[in-house]
């Protein structure tokens, strides 16, 4: 379109130089005339509006002015003819034609560049549309992915809230269980401490009872040794009786007294064995039960005291009988010298008891019984102290 307009605009190139010059001059003059006509017409419009009856005068003025313009036009045409004859003007016209030709070439180049620009612009717009489509698609995918992630996060949030509620409830239950466990642990520790103390007391009591039992066993052994010595003495007395008929009466009394003493000693030994068995039973009960009530302690103490009192009375009676027996045996010393020798032999066989330091008599001594009774009393006393 631009090239067609250019061709139309510059179609006067085919005209001759003079004709073109005249046309240019006419165009210039016509333009000037038109401008003047327009100015004059603008100036005339107001008077016509003011007075419609004065138009002949104005018409005559216009005719006059038209004539003047024609004269001016002729002057310009003459000036144009003079210019065509001027070599400098012709050179300028040739240069003008070259410039117009180059302008046409440039215009063609501009059209090609414009076409390329439009093609590039179309490609750019296509790429932009494609990029926009891809961007919209990517945005939709990201939006969808974001919504899915949001839904997933919301589900996880709800799950975490439920888990937190469950965890809080479980933690509260565990706290209660832990508190109960701690309380039970404290009770068990207190009970364990109590049992430990009771065990220490029981061990101490058992050790004391063991020592008492050992002392009782030692006393029993000593009593059995005394009994064996008495049995040997009795046998020796029987032999002495066969040897000395002269001292038969005295020996008979001594033998009878010895038999009575032996029976008493055997009875006392049996009673001491029963006491020892009772002490062993008591020790066993203490080991199994580990504790006695106050009532049982009182009963046991009263029983032991009663038995000790009875045993002491019995031992006192035996001591009196032994004293009487010794007194009765003194006058018969001259009649039976062999019996005296036998008694002196018995005296030489006397031993010292390691527990009390007393001299062992041929009969049951008070020291042995006292040891057994003291062992029972000591065991009871230690248990009460514990």
Swiss-Prot record:
Gene Ontology cellular-component terms listed: extracellular region
Matching InterPro entries: LPXTG_anchor, M_anchor, M_repeat, SMCR, SMDRR, YSIRK_signal_dom
C-type repeats, residues: 158-192, 193-227, 235-269
Propeptide: 357-386
Region spans: Disordered: 79-221, 233-268, 323-360
Membrane topology category: Peptidoglycan-anchor
Residue ranges annotated as motif LPXTG sorting signal: 353-357
Chain segments carrying region IgA-binding: 42-152
Segments annotated as D repeats: 302-307, 308-313, 316-321, 323-328
Main location: secreted
Biased composition (Polar residues): 339-359
Keyword Cell wall biogenesis/degradation carried by entry: no
Modified residues (Pentaglycyl murein peptidoglycan amidated threonine): 356
Signal sequence bounds: 1-41
Superkingdom as given in the UniProt entry: Bacteria
Name of this protein: IgA receptor
Organism field: Streptococcus pyogenes
